[in-house]
Amino acid sequence: MLSKVVLLVALAAICGAQGASYAGRHTADMDFLHKQKKIFDLLLYVRQADLSDAEWYDVGRNYDMESNMDMYKDKNVVQKFLWWYKQGMFLSRNAIFTPLNSEQKYEVRMLFELLYNAKDFQTFYKTAAWARLRMNSGMFTTAFSIAVLYRPDTKYMKFPAIYEIYPNYFFDSSVIEEAQNLKMSRGSSVVTGMNNIETYIVNTNYSSKNMREYNDPEYKLDYFMEDVELNAYYYYMREMLPYWMSSSQYHMPKEIRGQLYYFLHKQLMTRYFLERMSNDLGKTAEFDWNKPINSGFYSTIMYSNGVTFPQRNRFSSLPYYKYKYLNVINALEMRLMDAIDSGYLIDEYGKKIDIYTPEGLNMLGNVIEGSSDSINTKFYGMYDILARDILGYNFDFQNKNNLIPSALQSYSTSMRDPAFYMLYQNILSYFLRYKKLQPQYSQSELQMPGVKFESVNIDKLYTYFDKCDTLINNAVAVENFKGGMYLRLKARRACMNYERFTYKININSDKETKGMMRIFLGPAFDEIKHDMVYLQKYFYLFMEMDRFAVTLRPGSNSIERQSSESPFTTSTIMPSDIFYDKLNKAIGGSEPFTYSEKMLGFPERLILPRGKPEGMRYKMFFFLSSMDESNTKSYEIPLYGKMTLDDKVFGFPLDRPMWAWNFTIPNMYFKDVFIYNRPNEESMNY
């Protein structure tokens, strides 16, 4: 029972709490408002440590950590941190930070532990202000953000979106340069006057606009791979449960981690495949460590210190300086395959641990990610991190301050590289093999007696390209903090969107009962006509779109569901300038300030693949299962708040092969749908 509930928790974390019920929004009191403003201010213009008019500046400059040792839960954490700092051993302020480097991982964990161990909010704030002035900005941003998520006294508090903190990770260097030019040519009057807020728009394109000579078909998907909110979503999903954090120490249910790692990437890869279909690209190419990599990586995004991200040409072989990792990666792959086929992992004491148990998937996920909860990191290594290092093609530097990480070594840029999808297709193949070796579902597990789908009708499905603006103030340097608040620089880009639609479902029931409706979207292939055979072959290519509880009455039941109600998704994150204005008005007493326990989900506007102008066929799969309210459980996870979940596993019933049965399943329903893309030349400026 526990494992089933946990699987749902993992899905909830991925997509916004599938089938979960949330507490409502809250109205902030004055204590919450002042804390929220302090947190937000610390991440504005985070690369500048010279903003002497900011509140945190004097706080951080005057704070003496050694004199306040009693204000931390664990003095050893403070002593260790200060020793490292005094020895000058931390990453330099202008170096490039990546949590996937072993030295930098150790350092960001020390900074996080320092912030987390502060006994009260004031000590936490003073410590953060001190670190804001002295530590590497990327390391500070990561450690501080995670501390805010996990500290009880900062629960539900928001920070600027990562694309607003580091716009250079999301927009090409030409955009950053134009923003800086605008600031130099027009921003000075804003800073000195500070009477009016002035907004400037910088138009931007996707990578394919600047690289047609490379003719790489993978970049037909640049509007998806480089989507700002999608990349931010992935960043937060990985940062929410850092691989270096021990779940037993930080109120992070241990049984979540492995499933979350798997389900996050399963959902993303399925959604990516559906987008490939809209562009006639077929399945993602497989790769071999000993052969050239098909896809290149071409981008002009750059790090904050002006260094461009390492590139990779099409069909390029592994560089010689990565050869030393080949034996290691091949050994790790062999050990993973042996574990799946034999049915057991080997822990650090040499004991065999059965993985074909309710806890097995979680253990396998931890091992592949190489998280702190892996049962044997020494033997199974950190496959995910090592594979990213090899595929990134970046140079190996002995000095951490000279390191230039690849796009794959930053969670906020990983999805821009086509190799990301090749890598995770390979990783998911291990999980798929594991799933295929599990027993098929029985009739009693699948059927819902007395319940039958009568019909399903759906509005016509349309996608289009809209204009999206992103605040990029952090791309420029400002003379002072207050003046920076009166300048609004925004990058405008075409972004895919969809027209909201309604599901109209008719179900017949012979009794009053409660159930859970699951809706999936998958590809439509013509070679297989029988639905059961189709699911047997392509079950793993379906993405779960929605999930909600229903109460059925005897007889015919009509159910209407809006696409925007999906708990998997969230609408566009409120821009920082609007959020900050609302926050200040609330502090001034002119209007109330409300906040939600749920702050993140998959971008709603990307819930549908693009389709085609003439329409493209996909398949929707509807499944209704019984729900026992006595088997529900509640959990609370950073960014997602409190969730109440049922007892079915993630992706049920498409989490494993669906064999052709000798019985009927009236509580499932297939429907062909067509997705139409409305061309918009004005918005599609790429």
From Swiss-Prot:
Single annotated GO MF: nutrient reservoir activity
Domain Hemocyanin N-terminal positions: 32-155
Tissue: Expressed in the fat body and secreted into the hemolymph (at protein level). Present in trophocytes and oenocytes of the fat body (at protein level). Not expressed in ovary or testis.
Record localization: Secreted; Nucleus; Cytoplasm; Cytoplasmic granule
Endpoints of the signal sequence: 1-19
Domain Hemocyanin C-terminal: 440-676
GO cellular component, one term: cytoplasm
Record's note on what induces expression: In 5th instar larvae induced by juvenile hormone. May be post-transcriptionally repressed by miRNA.
Keywords in alphabetical order: Cytoplasm, Glycoprotein, Nucleus, Secreted, Signal, Storage protein
Residue positions the entry lists as glycosylated: N205, N662
rRNA-binding found in the keyword field: no
Gene3D superfamilies named among the record's database cross-references: Di-copper center containing domain from catechol oxidase, Hemocyanin, C-terminal domain, Hemocyanin, N-terminal domain
Domain of life: Eukaryota
InterPro entries referenced in this protein's UniProt entry, alphabetically: Di-copper_centre_dom_sf, Hemocyanin/hexamerin, Hemocyanin/hexamerin_mid_dom, Hemocyanin_C, Hemocyanin_C_sf, Hemocyanin_N, Hemocyanin_N_sf, Ig_E-set
Disulfide bonds: none
Residue ranges of every copy of the Hemocyanin middle domain listed in the record: 161-431
Subunit and partners: Probable homohexamer.
General function of this protein: Storage protein that may function as a nutrient supply to compensate for lack of dietary proteins during metamorphosis and egg production.
Additional notes on this entry: Hexamerins are evolutionarily related to hemocyanins but do not bind copper and have lost the ability to bind oxygen.
Similarity section: Belongs to the hemocyanin/hexamerin family.
Annotated protein name in UniProt: Hexamerin 70c
Gene field: Hex70c
